[in-house]
Protein backbone atom coordinates (compact mmCIF):
# COMPACT_ATOMS: atom_id res chain seq x y z
CA UNK A 1 0.00 0.00 0.00
CA UNK A 2 1.45 3.30 -1.11
CA UNK A 3 1.26 6.28 1.23
CA UNK A 4 0.81 9.69 -0.29
CA UNK A 5 3.53 12.19 0.52
CA UNK A 6 2.60 15.81 0.88
CA UNK A 7 3.82 18.31 -1.66
CA UNK A 8 6.16 21.04 -0.40
CA UNK A 9 3.43 23.67 -0.91
CA UNK A 10 1.07 21.73 1.38
CA UNK A 11 3.78 21.36 4.02
CA UNK A 12 4.33 25.12 3.92
CA UNK A 13 0.58 25.73 4.24
CA UNK A 14 0.36 23.35 7.22
CA UNK A 15 3.23 25.12 8.97
CA UNK A 16 1.81 28.57 8.12
CA UNK A 17 -1.62 27.55 9.43
CA UNK A 18 -0.13 26.80 12.87
CA UNK A 19 0.08 30.52 13.62
CA UNK A 20 -3.10 31.51 11.79
CA UNK A 21 -6.05 29.93 13.57
CA UNK A 22 -7.68 32.95 15.19
CA UNK A 23 -10.56 34.39 13.14
CA UNK A 24 -9.53 38.01 13.74
CA UNK A 25 -5.95 37.25 12.73
CA UNK A 26 -7.17 35.54 9.56
CA UNK A 27 -9.41 38.50 8.65
CA UNK A 28 -6.49 40.87 9.19
CA UNK A 29 -4.38 38.67 6.91
CA UNK A 30 -7.01 38.79 4.16
CA UNK A 31 -6.79 42.58 4.33
CA UNK A 32 -3.11 43.17 5.12
CA UNK A 33 -1.29 40.56 3.01
CA UNK A 34 -2.59 41.88 -0.34
CA UNK A 35 -1.86 45.44 0.81
CA UNK A 36 1.69 44.45 1.78
CA UNK A 37 2.23 42.87 -1.64
CA UNK A 38 0.83 45.95 -3.37
CA UNK A 39 2.89 48.38 -1.31
CA UNK A 40 6.10 46.37 -1.62
CA UNK A 41 5.62 46.10 -5.36
CA UNK A 42 4.98 49.85 -5.50
CA UNK A 43 8.07 50.64 -3.42
CA UNK A 44 10.31 48.52 -5.64
CA UNK A 45 8.59 50.02 -8.71
CA UNK A 46 9.53 53.47 -7.36
CA UNK A 47 13.27 52.78 -7.40
CA UNK A 48 14.72 54.61 -10.40
CA UNK A 49 15.55 52.24 -13.25
CA UNK A 50 18.04 53.09 -16.00
CA UNK A 51 16.72 54.02 -19.42
CA UNK A 52 17.20 51.19 -21.92
CA UNK A 53 17.06 52.53 -25.47
CA UNK A 54 15.68 49.51 -27.30
CA UNK A 55 12.62 49.42 -25.03
CA UNK A 56 11.50 52.77 -26.38
CA UNK A 57 8.05 53.76 -25.12
CA UNK A 58 7.89 50.58 -23.00
CA UNK A 59 10.68 51.69 -20.66
CA UNK A 60 8.14 52.48 -17.93
CA UNK A 61 6.99 48.88 -17.85
CA UNK A 62 10.41 47.37 -17.20
CA UNK A 63 11.79 48.31 -13.83
CA UNK A 64 13.17 46.74 -10.67
CA UNK A 65 9.70 45.43 -9.83
CA UNK A 66 9.83 43.40 -13.05
CA UNK A 67 12.64 41.33 -11.54
CA UNK A 68 10.75 40.92 -8.26
CA UNK A 69 7.66 39.80 -10.18
CA UNK A 70 9.66 37.34 -12.29
CA UNK A 71 11.39 35.85 -9.23
CA UNK A 72 8.20 35.50 -7.19
CA UNK A 73 6.10 34.05 -10.03
CA UNK A 74 8.88 31.53 -10.76
CA UNK A 75 9.07 30.60 -7.06
CA UNK A 76 5.29 30.17 -6.93
CA UNK A 77 5.34 28.16 -10.17
CA UNK A 78 7.80 25.72 -8.60
CA UNK A 79 5.38 25.23 -5.72
CA UNK A 80 2.11 25.22 -7.68
CA UNK A 81 1.55 26.30 -11.29
CA UNK A 82 -2.12 27.10 -10.63
CA UNK A 83 -1.33 29.34 -7.66
CA UNK A 84 1.43 31.05 -9.66
CA UNK A 85 -1.06 31.90 -12.44
CA UNK A 86 -3.46 33.31 -9.86
CA UNK A 87 -0.66 35.38 -8.31
CA UNK A 88 0.38 36.64 -11.73
CA UNK A 89 -3.19 37.77 -12.39
CA UNK A 90 -3.27 39.59 -9.04
CA UNK A 91 0.12 41.17 -9.74
CA UNK A 92 -1.15 42.42 -13.11
CA UNK A 93 -4.12 44.06 -11.36
CA UNK A 94 -1.79 45.52 -8.72
CA UNK A 95 0.54 46.80 -11.45
CA UNK A 96 -2.41 48.61 -13.03
CA UNK A 97 -3.07 50.20 -9.62
CA UNK A 98 0.56 51.25 -9.31
CA UNK A 99 0.57 52.77 -12.80
CA UNK A 100 -2.61 54.64 -11.85
CA UNK A 101 -0.87 56.00 -8.74
CA UNK A 102 2.09 57.04 -10.90
CA UNK A 103 -0.32 58.99 -13.11
CA UNK A 104 -1.83 60.59 -10.01
CA UNK A 105 1.65 61.61 -8.87
CA UNK A 106 2.40 63.15 -12.30
CA UNK A 107 -0.78 65.21 -12.05
CA UNK A 108 0.28 66.69 -8.71
CA UNK A 109 -0.83 63.97 -6.28
CA UNK A 110 1.26 62.36 -3.56
CA UNK A 111 4.37 60.40 -4.49
CA UNK A 112 3.91 56.69 -5.23
CA UNK A 113 6.64 55.75 -2.76
CA UNK A 114 4.98 57.77 0.01
CA UNK A 115 1.58 56.14 -0.52
CA UNK A 116 3.26 52.73 -0.54
CA UNK A 117 5.26 53.40 2.64
CA UNK A 118 2.07 54.40 4.47
CA UNK A 119 0.21 51.30 3.23
CA UNK A 120 3.21 49.07 4.03
CA UNK A 121 3.61 50.33 7.61
CA UNK A 122 -0.13 50.29 8.34
CA UNK A 123 -0.46 46.77 6.94
CA UNK A 124 2.42 45.42 9.00
CA UNK A 125 0.92 47.01 12.10
CA UNK A 126 -2.30 45.15 11.25
CA UNK A 127 -0.36 41.91 10.83
CA UNK A 128 1.37 42.25 14.19
CA UNK A 129 -1.92 43.13 15.90
CA UNK A 130 -3.38 39.95 14.42
CA UNK A 131 -0.50 37.86 15.71
CA UNK A 132 -0.74 39.52 19.14
CA UNK A 133 -4.42 38.52 19.25
CA UNK A 134 -3.50 35.02 18.02
CA UNK A 135 -0.82 34.75 20.69
CA UNK A 136 1.74 33.37 18.24
CA UNK A 137 4.67 34.96 16.49
CA UNK A 138 4.57 35.43 12.71
CA UNK A 139 5.79 32.42 10.69
CA UNK A 140 8.44 34.43 8.86
CA UNK A 141 10.37 34.91 12.11
CA UNK A 142 11.23 31.19 11.87
CA UNK A 143 11.77 31.09 8.11
CA UNK A 144 11.84 34.09 5.79
CA UNK A 145 10.26 31.93 3.04
CA UNK A 146 6.95 32.40 4.79
CA UNK A 147 6.90 36.02 3.61
CA UNK A 148 6.32 34.54 0.15
CA UNK A 149 3.93 31.82 1.35
CA UNK A 150 1.33 34.16 2.88
CA UNK A 151 -0.15 35.36 -0.43
CA UNK A 152 -0.58 31.90 -1.93
CA UNK A 153 -1.83 30.56 1.40
CA UNK A 154 -4.77 32.93 0.99
CA UNK A 155 -5.24 31.90 -2.65
CA UNK A 156 -5.33 28.21 -1.78
CA UNK A 157 -8.47 28.85 0.27
CA UNK A 158 -10.13 30.31 -2.83
CA UNK A 159 -9.05 27.27 -4.84
CA UNK A 160 -10.47 24.92 -2.21
CA UNK A 161 -13.73 26.89 -2.03
CA UNK A 162 -14.37 26.74 -5.79
CA UNK A 163 -12.95 23.24 -6.29
CA UNK A 164 -9.78 24.10 -8.21
CA UNK A 165 -6.90 21.68 -7.69
CA UNK A 166 -3.77 23.64 -7.04
Give, region by region, the residue ranges found by the protein language model.
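Juxtamembrane "helix exit" motif at the C-terminal ends of alpha-helical transmembrane segments
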Residues: 37-56, 92-103
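Structural signature of hydrophobic alpha-helical transmembrane segments
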Residues: 51-66, 113-118
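Short hydrophobic alpha-helical membrane-embedded segments
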Residues: 30-33, 59-68, 86-91
Amino acid sequence: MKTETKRPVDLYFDKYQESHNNETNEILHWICVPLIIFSLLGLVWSIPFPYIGFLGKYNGFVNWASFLIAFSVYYYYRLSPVLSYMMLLLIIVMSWGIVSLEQLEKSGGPALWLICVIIFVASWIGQFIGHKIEGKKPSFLDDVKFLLIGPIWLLHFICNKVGIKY
